[in-house]
Amino acid sequence: MKEFNTRQIVEKYNFRFSKRLGQNFLTDNTVLDDIVENAEIQKDDFIIEIGPGVGTLTRRLLEKAKKVCAIELDESLIPIITNEMKEYDNFTLIHNDALKVDFNNIIGEEQSVKLVANLPYYVTTPIISKLLNEGYNFKSLTIMIQKEVGDRIAAKPSTKDYGALTLLVQYYCDVKVVRVVKPSCFIPQPKVDSLVIRLDKLEKPRVQVKDEKLFFNVIRSAFNMRRKTLWNAMKGLKLSSEDLEKAFEAAGIDSKRRGETLSIEEFGKLSDEIYR
């Protein structure tokens, strides 16, 4: 593989970073190699990359995968990455906002699909939510995100980071924390640490619930009023006190507990009893 230096490419094209788009390009080759290694890319994999920047990670992906499709929002990066990747016939570039993309149109008939990306901090949670909630056929997501968000995704019950995002991700995926990435590994340097994590999609959700929408409504209610007891938090579901009391009793959950103490299995039991 050719030497491909992020700083050199940025200087070559006199690229100007956009604060609005949260652009921080990874320059550390060890971190780049760790991302690719932990993505476990096979020669028949179809890789989707969100926010390729100047293509530092992209090139490594192209050397290993069958195809790479990159989605980039910044119009000023389109000619740069197009020119830098012109030697690869297994590369496709889409100029669009990843939050507006129907990934099924990109995936098509591909069977082994993985997402690998250095996600902009400001859209991390919306993108993860979209990718998981809309049921796309990804085997895994290997992503670099703000450490604060990564800590929330990997959190355990009864910790300060445990919340609705934790349960959304762990409902659909196994979570592996790969490594911490320091600000010095980027240009320009962000103000906080980053985290590389890998999310492996489960064949079926971690818990089987009768009504998925209700399940997530129960979770949101519990964490919208995090410091309140479950009894007070669930009042927003507009159930009678009698029905709510029956649901807690049938689920075997003390209504004086707080949402942050419940496991995903307990949230499943509670939502199923409320559904009755």
Swiss-Prot record:
Q: What is its EC number?
A: 2.1.1.182
Q: What class of enzyme is it?
A: transferase
Q: Name one GO cellular component term.
A: cytosol
Q: Which UniProt keywords apply?
A: Cytoplasm, Methyltransferase, RNA-binding, rRNA processing, S-adenosyl-L-methionine, Transferase
UniProt entry tagged with the keyword Phosphoprotein: no
Substrates-to-products reaction catalysed: adenosine(1518)/adenosine(1519) in 16S rRNA + 4 S-adenosyl-L-methionine = N(6)-dimethyladenosine(1518)/N(6)-dimethyladenosine(1519) in 16S rRNA + 4 S-adenosyl-L-homocysteine + 4 H(+)
Using the record for this protein, list the coiled-coil segments as residue ranges, or answer none. none
Q: Per UniProt, where does S-adenosyl-L-methionine bind?
A: 24, 26, 51, 72, 97, 118
Q: Does the keyword Coiled coil apply?
A: no
Which HAMAP family does the annotation name?
16SrRNA_methyltr_A (MF_00607)
Name of the protein described by the UniProt record: Ribosomal RNA small subunit methyltransferase A
Organism of origin: Clostridium acetobutylicum (strain ATCC 824 / DSM 792 / JCM 1419 / IAM 19013 / LMG 5710 / NBRC 13948 / NRRL B-527 / VKM B-1787 / 2291 / W)
